[in-house]
Amino acid sequence: MVVPFPGSPRPTLGVEWEIALVDRVTRDLSNTAAEVFDAVANLAGPEDPRITKELLRNTVELVTGIHSTVGEAMDDLDESLDLLRRAANPLGVDLICAGTHPFAQWSTQLVTRTPDYDELIERTQWWGRQMLIWGVHVHVGVSSPQKVFPILNALLQRYPHLLALSASSPMWAGVNTGYASNRALMFQQLPTAGLPYQFANWGQYEDFISDQMKTGVITKIGGMHWDIRPAPRWGTIEVRVFDGISTRAELSSLVALVHCLIVDLDRRFEAGENLPNLQPWHVKENKWRAARYGLDAEIILDEDSNERLVTDDLNDLLEKLAPTAVRLGCADELAAVAEIPRRGASYQRQRQVAEATGGDLVAVVDALVKELGT
C-alpha cells in the first residue's frame, strides 16, 4: 500500500509533554482529568487543542503547534502549563512529570473511555493496564520519505544518549527497580511498541504497514508506537525515547538535542554521506544498558563494537552539534544538555531524595512537584 508522506520543507518542531496529576495531600495519582478539562474549558474555552486526553485519567498531555525553534515551542508549552496549573490548583491537584510515579498502583487507575483506548486495553489486557508511564515526544519535519529511514536508523546510534539523559523512572509501585528507566522496558511489552525495524527505504515500510493492516495488527497507519517512528500525517520523524522530563530547563535542552541531531543527519544525507546504521542487536543492547545504568552506561558506538561511557561520548556529540545549534537558534539550550550529568539526571535525584528521607516516597513526589515549577 502507499503511505503518503507530505514532507516538511523546513525542519519544523513539535513537542508532546505528558503530565501526571497528583493529589496535593496524599501525593498519590489523582484520576481527575475530566474535572481538570472542565476547568480548562471554563478558563480558556472548550476543546483547547494544546491540552489533550491520554490513556489514563490521571494524565494530561500538552501539545504544541508547529514551530521553527526550540524557544517558540517552549513558549507554547509554558502557556499550556500555566493554564493547566490554574485549572488544577482549585481542585487540590498538583503536577509532575516523570517516567513513572514512585508508589502509585496501576490497579487503582481509571482508563479514559475512547474507542482507541478501549481497543488497546481489550487487546493487550494485563500489560495494557500496566502502562502507568509518562514520556515526551518530539517531532522534527523532514522534506521527503526517502530521507526518513536513513535518518531514523542513524538516530538509533544516539538512542542511549537520549534515554540516559531523560531517565526518570527508577521506582515502580513503591519498589526501587534498580533501573534508571523502568518505563522504557515496560512500554516495549506492548505488541506495537519498542524499537523500530531498521528498514532500508520507504518502500519496505509501506510493505510492512500493508502486512500489519491486512493481518489486523493495526487498523490505521499511526498504530505503530515505536520509540522512534515516522509520523506520515505530519511529515515528521517522531522521537519517543524520552522518559517524562521533570524540569522545563531539561525539557528545552533535550528538545534542542533532538532538533539538532535530525537536522544534522538531514544535512549529511543531502551531502551524499552514508549515514551510520548500527546492527540491530547493538541497538537493542544499548537500549537495555541505558535503561539499566542511565548515565553510567557503557554503550556500543559502532559496527566494530567499540564501547565508551555514554557521558564521554555525549561531550563529543555536543561539540559536533554546536554549529547546527547556532543555525537553529538553540545554542544555549543545546549547551545546557551538559548540565544534566553534572546536576544528576532525574532518576538519580529521585533516589537521592528517597535515601535522604529514609525511603519516604511521598517526599520524592514533593520534589518532583517542586521541580516542575522550575
UniProtKB/Swiss-Prot annotation:
Catalytic activity: L-cysteine + L-glutamate + ATP = gamma-L-glutamyl-L-cysteine + ADP + phosphate + H(+)
Keyword Nucleotide-binding: yes
GO biological process per UniProt: modified amino acid biosynthetic process
Top-level taxon of the source organism: Bacteria
Keyword Ligase part of the UniProt annotation: yes
Keywords linked to the UniProt accession: ATP-binding, Ligase, Nucleotide-binding
EC number from the UniProt entry: 6.3.2.2
GO terms, molecular function: ATP binding; glutamate-cysteine ligase activity
A Pfam family annotated for this UniProt entry: GCS2
Residue pairs linked by disulfide bridges in the UniProt entry: none
Enzyme class: ligase
Function: ATP-dependent carboxylate-amine ligase which exhibits weak glutamate--cysteine ligase activity.
Family, per entry: Belongs to the glutamate--cysteine ligase type 2 family. YbdK subfamily.
PANTHER family in alphabetical order: GLUTAMATE--CYSTEINE LIGASE 2-RELATED
Protein name in UniProt: Putative glutamate--cysteine ligase 2-2
Source organism (scientific name): Rhodococcus jostii (strain RHA1)
